[in-house]
Swiss-Prot record:
Keywords: ATP-binding, Magnesium, Manganese, Metal-binding, mRNA processing, Nucleotide-binding, Nucleotidyltransferase, Nucleus, Phosphoprotein, RNA-binding, Transferase, Zinc, Zinc-finger. PANTHER family: POLY A POLYMERASE CID PAP -RELATED, SPECKLE TARGETED PIP5K1A-REGULATED POLY(A) POLYMERASE. The lineage of its organism: Eukaryota, Metazoa, Chordata, Craniata, Vertebrata. Residues 669-687 have a biased composition (Basic and acidic residues). It comes from Rattus norvegicus (Rat). Disulfide bonds: none annotated. It catalyses: RNA(n) + UTP = RNA(n)-3'-uridine ribonucleotide + diphosphate; RNA(n) + ATP = RNA(n)-3'-adenine ribonucleotide + diphosphate. Residues 56-128 form the RRM domain. Phosphorylated by CK1 in the proline-rich (Pro-rich) region. Pfam families: MTPAP-like_central, PAP_assoc, RRM_1, zf-met. This is Speckle targeted PIP5K1A-regulated poly(A) polymerase. Binds 1 divalent cation per subunit. Its cofactor is Mg(2+); Mn(2+). UTP binds at D216, D218, N393, R415, Y433, H550. Its EC number is 2.7.7.19, 2.7.7.52.
């Protein structure tokens, strides 16, 4: 038990944390259940196995690279049985030899000298490192120091201070920036030997002021005019081992300086392929990571239309066809030439840059690149030859961060939020560049604006700042001090809440979010041809600030776009709570912490919609509340009613001004107000729509269920009498019956179109539920009673099952401890679906709950509404 106790740490308010499994429990019973569970027992056994292996193992080095595990095994078997040998996969210069028992290991260590094939072996005991369980390892893209991050954020004074602290913890240190500068200088020195006059420009995260630990090093190799005579790449001398080489290699990795060929003659195609085969694993394992640049989209945009031909050639079909063939042939030649140069750059990286490995040319990308890894610095990077536009994208982002100090904290926070919710990354997800542009567009649409539009910046550019790249106007001031500061003084906490609220209701597919104009351009109405040339529309349309033919979110699928808006809606709902606005005096998570909790699996599950039965929406609302509160024992804190028609609102509607939740301080306008559409929501909302309402369930239950069966201020229980009354008030009618009836129109307009509940659970009421229900049914059968025949009887049975799972001291545990998890359940009348999204899930229980609700909710509503 002592070993188990050493893994457990006591937390405030009766909580416990298992450091071995990286799990936090709400109380002692939950801790005992965890310690007896399979996950904890398996990790305890794995730790014991690893410790025993370490005590039987030795570290061996000094043998040649051509020595294999079979030769080592044959040698060490002279001292005793050999259980396993692990070779160094990277360099092949060391091995871990696990002997069959401790006595064999002691025999190896007692030998004063070991030699194999004429080489002296260095043998020493294996270093005993602290066991790190797979559960405690951070998922890809998540900060490995999450606990330190959470502690630092919890100690901040307010949400704004949390956001500033997040920037300090995630940005590059000065030493990391200097290391990147050295790598760029090394690349510059090497490539200058082959391409005199070339310039290596860094762009992307390293220079756009949104850098994070471990971000890629994106480089643009500017070769100048390729048509000018270039020196013969076969004859130049190789760069000598300079101070840059020694700075990067000797201090970080003494074995990084490899022998380089005397000339590129030795870099034959065969040798290059062999080298690549040695450096690479599989192409799939080297999928490009999403950079913070225009390289982020893996999709290929539509090709530009051919230049217009003269009227004379239009009359000559043969001449036109010949012209097209000539252009196609010229384009093919240029592509082949660019590919050849790209391969040459890859060859130089492989053979002439110390410490570079895993070089891969990607000519098929939208912007062809050469990917590489630099062993001494641990950096991953890309080199592109035709991406000058990305330099100005990076400088534009840097200018935006200099214009207003709130830009960086907001971008860092939203990047971290999107990362933890599985919304950003590669493939169909948002890349960091697109997410950053989305934040800048949002800041352009505030009233007053936080940032100016790109068109306004172009007008304020000076004579020396007029730049055109690839036919696109990239003019903007270089010095932010020349620009007038924004008159917007809203705090960071308010801007973050507004972002979530606005994105949740923007029309992402029906409009084009333009940073140049600072407004949403409707897709249906058509745009000027110069804005549409080659633009590929999709479920999410976000225009590049300079290359107006590029949709930076073209790779985003409809599913990801819906999940983005759903997650923003859940986050906006949370930002209205006191838990977000005020620091907790009880030590519970507050402010940014619930938003930044790792929940990628949960967020993926929350995109799966739970279908609702065909019934009047008020009946469904009432039944859902009863299922959540009575059948499952959820503590329901609040509900949200979303947009509805103002003109059709009943005069007797209980939704008066007193029921509106006060707006956040400084949040004067949001996208729900419908005012100044270009400054707020991008969607084409009706003028009669009113702002979002937040109603406390205990204050206005009649508006939720449209029932008056219970006492005032209390949500009525789902009884047969209430169901009958609901059916009388809202009888089921065939689809289309009574269409256009004024009375029905008024009645339907008074109902909420979308309802949300914030729910909390203190017990895992979904685990063992089938077994508990089976026991109850057996007892009922033995007593001679039949099964439930009405919705009320079914509800009573499920409530009893829940109470049995919770235990006799459930109420005391609820008052003393924190909930296991909290989630938001949102019912939509238009889509007739229920969405469940996690808010707080420290133990990762939401996937199990969601799987249970997918089956339980439809069946429960069917039983209640039959």
């Amino acid at each position: 038990m002592a070993a188990v106790d050493s893994d457990v740490v006591s937390l405030p308010r009766g909580r416990f944390r298992c450091c071995l499994c990286d799990v936090t429990t709400a109380n002692r019973p939950s801790l005992d259940a965890h310690l007896k569970g399979r996950k904890h027992r398996d990790l305890v056994q794995l730790r014991a196995t690893r410790k025993a292996q370490g005590l039987r193992s030795v570290f061996v080095s000094g043998f040649p690279r051509d020595v294999g595990s079979a030769q080592l095994s044959e040698y060490f078997q002279t001292f005793g049985p050999v259980a396993n040998i692990v070779m160094d996969k990277d360099k092949g210069v060391f091995a871990i030899v696990e002997m069959g028992d401790i006595s064999a290991r002691e025999a190896v260590l007692s030998q004063p000298k070991h030699s194999l094939g004429g080489h002296t072996l260095r043998v020493r005991p294996r270093e005993q490192k602290e066991f790190q369980s797979p559960a405690s390892k951070s998922p890809k893209g998540v900060d490995s120091n999450s606990h330190q991050l959470a502690q630092a954020l919890a100690e901040a004074a307010d949400v704004g201070a949390q956001m500033v602290k997040l920037v300090e913890l995630r940005e590059l240190s000065e030493a990391e920036r200097q290391l990147r500068t050295l790598v760029v200088a090394l690349m510059q020195e090497v490539f200058t030997e082959f391409f005199p006059g070339c310039v290596v420009h860094p762009f992307g995260s390293s220079v756009n002021s949104f850098d994070v630990h471990g971000c890629d090093l994106d480089l643009f190799l500017d070769l100048g005019d390729m048509e000018e005579p270039q020196p013969d790449p076969q004859t130049p001398k190789l760069p000598e081992a300079s101070s840059l080489d020694s700075t990067l290699a000797s201090s970080l990795d003494p074995q990084v300086l490899a022998c380089t060929p005397a000339s590129l003659d030795s870099l034959s195609p065969t040798s290059l392929q062999d080298s690549e085969a040695l450096d690479f694993e599989t192409p799939s394992s080297l999928a490009p990571q999403t950079p913070d640049s225009a390289l982020g989209s893996d999709t290929v945009t539509s090709p530009q239309s051919l230049p217009p031909v003269s009227p004379l050639e239009e009359d000559r079909g043969e001449g036109k066809h010949r012209k097209e063939l000539e252009l196609a042939e010229a384009s093919k030649d240029e592509k082949e030439e660019a590919t050849a140069v790209l391969e040459l750059v890859g060859s130089i990286l492989r053979g002439c840059v110390p410490g570079v490995y895993r070089v891969q040319t990607v000519p098929s990308a939208r912007r062809p690149v050469v990917k590489f890894c630099h062993r001494p610095s641990g950096l991953h990077g890309d080199i592109s030859l035709s991406n000058r536009l990305a330099l100005y994208n990076s400088r534009f982002l840097n200018l935006c961060s200099e214009m207003d100090s709130r830009v960086r904290p907001l971008v860092y926070t939203l990047r971290c939020w999107a990362q933890h919710n599985g919304l950003s990354g590669g493939g169909p997800l948002l890349n960091n560049y697109a997410l950053t542009l989305l934040v800048i567009y949002f800041l352009q649409t505030r009233d007053p604006p936080v940032l100016p539009t790109v068109a306004q910046l172009t007008q304020r550019s000076g004579e020396g700042e007029q730049v055109e790249v690839d036919g696109w106007d990239c003019s903007f001031p270089k010095d932010a001090s020349r620009l007038e500061p924004s008159t917007n003084v809203e705090p960071l906490s308010s801007l973050l809440a507004q972002f979530f609220s606005c994105v949740s209701c923007w029309d992402l597919s029906g409009s084009l979010l333009s940073l140049r104009e600072g407004q949403a351009l409707m897709v249906a109405g058509g745009l000027p041809s110069d804005l549409w040339e080659g633009l590929r529309l999709g479920p999410m349309n976000l225009q590049d600030p300079f290359d107006l033919s590029h949709n930076v979110a073209a790779n985003v699928t409809s599913r990801v776009a819906k999940r983005l808006q759903s997650s923003c809606g859940a986050a906006a709902s949370y930002c209205r709570s006191l838990q977000y606005q005020q620091r907790s005096s009880r030590g519970r998570d507050w402010g940014l912490l619930p938003l930044l909790q790792p929940s990628s699996p949960s967020s993926l599950l929350s995109a799966k919609l739970i279908p609702l039965p065909s019934a009047p929406f008020p009946q469904i609302i009432t039944a859902l509340v009863s299922v959540l509160r009575e059948a499952l024992g959820c503590h329901i804190e609040q509900g949200t009613k979303r947009r509805r028609s103002e003109g059709a609102r009943s005069k007797d509607s209980p939704l008066g001004g007193a029921n509106k939740r006060p707006r956040l301080s400084g949040q004067e306008k949001s996208c729900e107000e419908g005012k100044e559409e270009p400054q707020g929501c991008a969607g084409d909302h009706s003028e009669n729509e009113v702002e979002e309402m937040v109603i406390e369930l205990r204050e206005t239950p009649q508006d939720w269920a449209l029932l008056h069966c219970g006492p005032p201020g209390e949500l009525p229980l789902m009884t047969a009498k209430c169901l009958d009354k609901t059916a009388e008030q809202n009888p089921m009618e065939p689809e289309g019956a009574g269409e256009g009836s004024p009375g029905e129109t008024e009645k339907e307009a008074s109902h909420p179109s979308s309802v949300s509940w914030r729910c909390a659970l203190w017990h895992q009421i979904w685990q063992g539920r089938r077994r508990a229900r089976r026991r109850f049914q057996q007892q009922t059968k033995e007593e001679g009673r039949g099964g439930p025949s009405t919705g009320a009887e079914w509800l009573a049975v499920e409530a009893r099952v829940t109470q049995e799972l919770k235990g006799p001291k459930s109420e005391q545990q609820r008052l003393q401890g924190e909930p296991l998890l909290t989630f938001v359940a949102s019912a939509s009348q238009a889509e007739q679906t229920l969405t469940v999204a996690p808010l707080q899930d420290p133990q990762g229980l939401f996937p199990g709950l969601h799987h249970f609700l997918q089956v339980f909710i439809p069946q429960a509503l069917k039983n209640l509404l039959k």
